[in-house]
Amino acid sequence: MGESAESGSRQLPAMSPPRRSVAYRRKIVDALWWAACVCCLAVVITPTLWMLIGVVSRAVPVFHWSVLVQDSQGNGGGLRNAIIGTAVLAIGVILVGGTVSVLTGIYLSEFATGKTRSILRGAYEVLSGIPSIVLGYVGYLALVVYFDWGFSLAAGVLVLSVMSIPYIAKATESALAQVPTSYREAAEALGLPAGWALRKIVLKTAMPGIVTGMLVALALAIGETAPLLYTAGWSNSPPTGQLTDSPVGYLTYPIWTFYNQPSKSAQDLSYDAALLLIVFLLLLIFIGRLINWLSRRRWDV
């Protein structure tokens, strides 16, 4: 019995796989996972780089500074009216959509409870899933036709603001949720008014995240074409300041319209507009990243 037990114990190590084979299989699995990750990353990055290279290589040779100082004239001219119109639309979205969205996010994070919070969250999640062209058509029927605003700055700003509400509200709610609970508890323990603590402590801490979400939502809104075709129309002149019955130019219109024209000057202007829009969107994203970096650096210090 002793010999059989001893021989069995000697055979046990032979039943376990060699360590080298286990390590080798792990390396193979890791390599396959890394290869899959690289392939997925390439699927996302390659079309983006291809688009950027195509636009830049086509726009830079034909770009001239007169595009920035001349208004559109038919299918030619410059893009000053579109640049100013895009900037005015962006400011309007920040003022209207940003205000409503931030207040919505604050209410959901700090005051709403139970069923009310669930209903509001469900509402803006549904809103985020509605195609932009549908929002544009609804805006056309409601604002342009029913309220008789005509193609105008106000109609375009309002539709883009509605589009941006889900993204900014979600970003605001997430930024407020990341504020440590100890900040609120300390303010309450010191007897500070709830409104004062919210403005001076909670919102101040969450502001970088709110601003970043607002800039990302603004970049998404400004890159839209269909909602503005239905609401803002198009104008060869810069905005006059009139809110209704005054069409507005914007950079996505020449990209969509001039590209299909047989004239080479119109196609060149389309690529110039695409280049300017890409620069504008990248600038917004860069500002958002810079705000995040400065915020983290401040808290690390």
Curated annotation (Swiss-Prot):
Pfam families for this protein: BPD_transp_1
Keyword line: Cell membrane, Membrane, Phosphate transport, Transmembrane, Transmembrane helix, Transport
Assembly and interaction partners: The complex is composed of two ATP-binding proteins (PstB), two transmembrane proteins (PstC and PstA) and a solute-binding protein (PstS).
GO cellular component: plasma membrane
Coiled-coil intervals: none
Induction: Transcription slightly induced by phosphate starvation, part of the pstB3-pstS2-pstC1-pstA2 operon.
Domain ABC transmembrane type-1: 83-288
GO BP terms in the entry: phosphate ion transmembrane transport
Originating species: Mycobacterium tuberculosis (strain ATCC 25618 / H37Rv)
Compartments (UniProt record): Cell membrane
Broad class of where this protein is predominantly found: membrane
Record protein name field: Phosphate transport system permease protein PstA 2
Annotated membrane topology: Multi-pass membrane protein
Any GO molecular function: phosphate transmembrane transporter activity
PROSITE patterns: ABC_TM1
Family per record: Belongs to the binding-protein-dependent transport system permease family. CysTW subfamily.
Transmembrane segments: 36-56, 83-103, 127-147, 149-169, 209-229, 274-294
Task performed by this protein: Part of the binding-protein-dependent transport system for phosphate; probably responsible for the translocation of the substrate across the membrane.
Organism placement in taxonomy: Bacteria, Bacillati, Actinomycetota, Actinomycetes, Mycobacteriales
